[in-house]
Design a protein with these regions (language model features):
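Non-catalytic substrate-recognition and accessory regions of acyl/acetyltransferase enzymes
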Residues: 1-2, 137, 144-182
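Acyl-donor binding region in acyl/amide transferases
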Residues: 1-130, 135-144
Length: 182
């Protein structure tokens, strides 16, 4: 199933509610079809970001959320080449200490115009996603696309629980309806 913000009209794309509703739909689907074990998706890092910031983001994700086992089977057509000095890496990673929110603030400080770590990357990471590859997409304004996956069983309880409660409520209504019909 292909779902993404491209299906949302432009004026609502950067708002949190559509993304929340998309994730809610994803959770509903995974609960209805438990034979599917993984979600796979792409996240884009816009070419509006500097090469330095793009390199920082990729290194940060590879340092903290990379799955080398799965990544060995993926070969990007046009792999993004990280351009960072070791001193820059050490400074940023010492300052952020693998904390997504601290890292997001670093990107905000480095980038002009209030650019932050892309929302979809933050959302995937908060859902326990793993990154496996990065590719430059010349057909999408040379954005860097990250390929990520989530093992359904690794979704946080805070994501699944509200939908499970909704399922439970629906189930109870159906049972009560059937009892009333007897």
């Amino acid at each position: 199933i292909e779902m993404g913000r491209a299906f949302i009209i432009k004026e609502y794309q950067m708002r949190p509610m559509p993304l929340f509703l998309l994730w809610r739909g994803i959770v509903h689907t995974t609960l209805r079809y438990p034979e599917h074990k993984y979600l796979i998706g792409g996240v884009s890092i816009s070419n509006k970001f500097s090469e330095f910031s793009k390199s920082l983001m990729i290194e940060f994700m590879k340092s903290n959320y990379y799955d080398p086992y799965v990544a060995q089977y993926i070969n990007p057509k046009k792999e993004y080449k990280v351009k960072l000095k070791d001193a820059d890496k050490d400074f940023v990673f010492d300052a952020s200490k693998a904390d997504l929110n601290k890292f997001d603030k670093i990107i905000d400080e480095v980038e002009p115009g209030s650019l932050r770590l892309p929302v979809l990357i933050k959302k995937y990471i908060k859902q326990n996603a793993k990154v496996i590859a990065f590719n430059v997409d010349p057909l999408f304004n040379n954005a860097v696309d990250g390929l990520m996956y989530i093992r359904i069983s690794d979704l946080p309880e805070s994501t699944v629980k509200p939908v499970m409660e909704e399922f439970q409520s629906e189930w109870e209504k159906k049972i009560n309806f059937l009892k009333d019909q007897e």
